[in-house]
Amino acid sequence: MPHRKKKPFIEKKKAVSFHLVHRSQRDPLAADESAPQRVLLPTQKIDNEERRAEQRKYGVFFDDDYDYLQHLKEPSGPSELIPSSTFSAHNRREEKEETLVIPSTGIKLPSSVFASEFEEDVGLLNKAAPVSGPRLDFDPDIVAALDDDFDFDDPDNLLEDDFILQANKATGEEEGMDIQKSENEDDSEWEDVDDEKGDSNDDYDSAGLLSDEDCMSVPGKTHRAIADHLFWSEETKSRFTEYSMTSSVMRRNEQLTLHDERFEKFYEQYDDDEIGALDNAELEGSIQVDSNRLQEVLNDYYKEKAENCVKLNTLEPLEDQDLPMNELDESEEEEMITVVLEEAKEKWDCESICSTYSNLYNHPQLIKYQPKPKQIRISSKTGIPLNVLPKKGLTAKQTERIQMINGSDLPKVSTQPRSKNESKEDKRARKQAIKEERKERRVEKKANKLAFKLEKRRQEKELLNLKKNVEGLKL
């Protein structure tokens, strides 16, 4: 029977791959316990060359496998409103679960294994995260009430029943300010200083500043004079920020006001008026000639001058009065004394001395220079490291054998003395015997070299195998 090709269970060309990812925090089903928290995300098969060509259109020239186009967003075009179906989480027990059909393969999967089509603008984690810092979009009164700084017992903080009508009415201060603005606009650019002084003198009486009741009761006083007296046009600024505290975002409660006052007192010390001496041009005023204060100042001046004066019986050269009287005499009596400073000796305590008597903590040792280890060379013929294995000498049996060879196999013909009456035939025979002996000696020498070489190689291999076996048996 012909062998049939088995059909694969999954066709890679038509297959659809998914990534198992966590459900988005903006997904409405993220808070549903019955819905799975992990969903399937279809993978998009994009050719690398096509993706890189698309990236080059937008100026991305990185040659790697990362998809930089996922960070780009298409510009929003004209938008239109379309009716959307309301999303509702289905109960598995009551209603059947919806199925999603993948058009490329025709696979039907439940919709719960995929992410929701509609997502919220803010995720669950951002909704639960607390907001830190001042909230400028909140009413300061609401912030003060949340911080327990709002005084509910204060009658000024209570609203009347007709607070809307009262808020729409113009108060007396606003009317006064309107009158003041109109008068300021009518004023000319140049003013007479004498007239201002005359007007300002009318605003004060012998008792001091005018109170609010006095201002209201005094007839003929203009709104401008009252405003100048009450400093309506002046705004107190902070020395620290150069801004008025009314422009602050936070409502100033009692503790913050106390904190601001302390800062103001602290920065008053660094005002220009408090630094250095005042100029003489700014000092004004007068004092009587026979006043006690002037007499005390003169007495202090004469007393200080008398202390610095020294009466001399005879005329002497003027010396520096700031120096002490006996300073010159003491300088003459000074002598140079040489002091020898001895080097402080090292003092040993009992514990240090006892430690030198034993080798428990005292380990005297000579520091030696360790030479660099030699490089290991490997034989090209045997593959065994050279000069690593120990060299063995000849055994007693091998030495005895060599001695026997040396005693018995010595060349006899070459050592025999030549006769003086030797004939030509004897000489020719003797030379031929020497040649034969030398030839045999060369053959024997070559055989011995080969035998020793093979024996050396065999012994090196045995030692190497023995060393490997011993290392393998270590525990």
UniProtKB/Swiss-Prot annotation:
It is found in: Cytoplasm. It comes from the Eukaryota. GO terms for cellular component: cytosol; nucleoplasm; nucleus; preribosome, small subunit precursor. The modification Phosphoserine is found at residues 17, 24, 248, 331, 408. Residues 418-475 form a coiled coil. It holds the Pfam family LTV. Keywords: Coiled coil, Cytoplasm, Disease variant, Phosphoprotein, Ribosome biogenesis. GO terms for biological process: ribosomal small subunit biogenesis; ribosomal small subunit export from nucleus; ribosome biogenesis. Residues 184-213 have a biased composition (Acidic residues). Expressed in the epidermis. Residues 23-54, 74-99, 169-213, 405-447 are annotated as: Disordered. Residues 419-447 have a biased composition (Basic and acidic residues). The keyword Transmembrane helix does not apply. Changing residue 168 to S: In IPHAK; uncertain significance; due to a nucleotide substitution that creates a novel donor splice site resulting in aberrant splicing; small amounts of canonically spliced transcripts with the missense variant are also produced; decreased protein abundance in patient cells. Belongs to the LTV1 family. It is linked to Inflammatory poikiloderma with hair abnormalities and acral keratoses: An autosomal recessive disorder characterized by mottled hyper- and hypopigmentation of the skin, sparse scalp hair and eyelashes, sparse or absent eyebrows, and palmoplantar keratoses. Essential for ribosome biogenesis. This is Protein LTV1 homolog. It comes from Homo sapiens (Human).
